[in-house]
Amino acid sequence: TLGGGLGHTFTIVMFTQKFVDETGYTSLEEVIADRYPIKLITKKNGSLGELTAERVIEACGSSVEDFLSFATWEKTGTDAIKSGLQDDLYDMTIDHIDAGQATTTEICLTHDMYFVQLGDEALANMQTMGYAPIVMEAGTWNGQDTDINSMGSQQNVLVPASMDEELAYALTKAMCENKDEMAQAVASLGYFDPQTAGSAEMCGAPLHPGAIRYYEENG
């Protein structure tokens, strides 16, 4: 890789406000510990949202198999997720998205939702699974009044290990020294931080020698 952190995707866990009002639950860990028959709806198998939902459940101390022994889990398309939550047919959803994602934006504008804060232990467990800490800032969604500490997966620029070192150096330099221009083309790149782009936390593969040289020369 030439570096990571090109994006601002995060894990989002939401209960419907009706579920919170009727049950008193505000924590997924408590729901799982009490084996409450919660109704979860997410994207289909093979999506990052569905995979992240599995990881969240595991991070909260349950296997997916055990979770399904007391809860229900519908995996479907985004339109069905939206209508299912709006109609209170389901209690909860989990996804892995960026700010402004259309389905979540519409859900939060048309239905009262509760933004769930995962506990420190669950977040630490997700970090061991390859996710990186990220903050979902207050105001990201309608009705979200506080920051939510979350976990995201960082986008990387992957190149062949055989790439010429000078080319890798030049590409890394261009990426790190043109952040503003990149952000004008893709808004989420505004979160890219050249100071941390070469860190192990942001990179999902070994740094190319050309990238290493650039980061070492530039602190």
Name each model-derived stretch.
Residues 41, 155, 168-170:
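P-loop NTPase catalytic cores that bind/hydrolyze ATP
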Residues 30, 34-37, 55-63, 84, ...:
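Structured segments of extracytoplasmic/periplasmic soluble domains
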